[in-house]
Amino acid sequence: MNLTVLKVGGSQSRHEELPALCAALAEAGKRHPLLVVPGGGDFADGVRRCADRYPLSDSAAHWMAILAMDQYGLLLCDMISGSRPVRSLDEAAPIAGEGRVAVLLPHDWLRGEDPLPHSWDVTSDAIAAWVAGRAGSDRLVLVKDVDGLYDAAPASPDARLIDEMDVSRLPGNGGVDRYLAQALKEAACETWVVNGRFPERVAQLLTTGATRGTRVRKG
């Protein structure tokens, strides 16, 4: 069984399409083994506000932000019908194998292995890539609130969607975190960036292997 690791960005929690996305994931999980990695969302934004207000160490902010992912994960687990929270790959495999979505609460696992730099350059994008590498996944899906990666700021009228790119082009692209390229080189999996405000695109990708979005070729 090959797990698809799918990160649901925290930005999804600010849009009314989140329930429809969760319903689509619950349905897709019946046919495709899914491990959902949560973003941080409003929970991580609270950590950022604390870091702006107080002299938090990089390590404190790092672990607080990962605990924020656990919180968002519990929210997603409550909204994805039949899903279960998990804290390791060993817990995820049997749940996904039963046609239910496994939702990772990553703090305990990451705390035990501490595999990534303690920096705001590392977000849930890179964490999801690390998880995909550990799972031996063929595909990582980053669900965001834009159609994919662009050659300029998405709000710019001249911005063009990048349909396909090499992982070497990721550094400097503002749509993902700065550490993602390194994490993907180590994970060696195909990556897609898709818009979760259109749940049908996520379903199409899982079913057919392609949709509107950006495909990042594995390094």
Indicate where each model-derived feature is located:
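C-terminal catalytic "cap/lid" subdomain
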Residues: 1-219
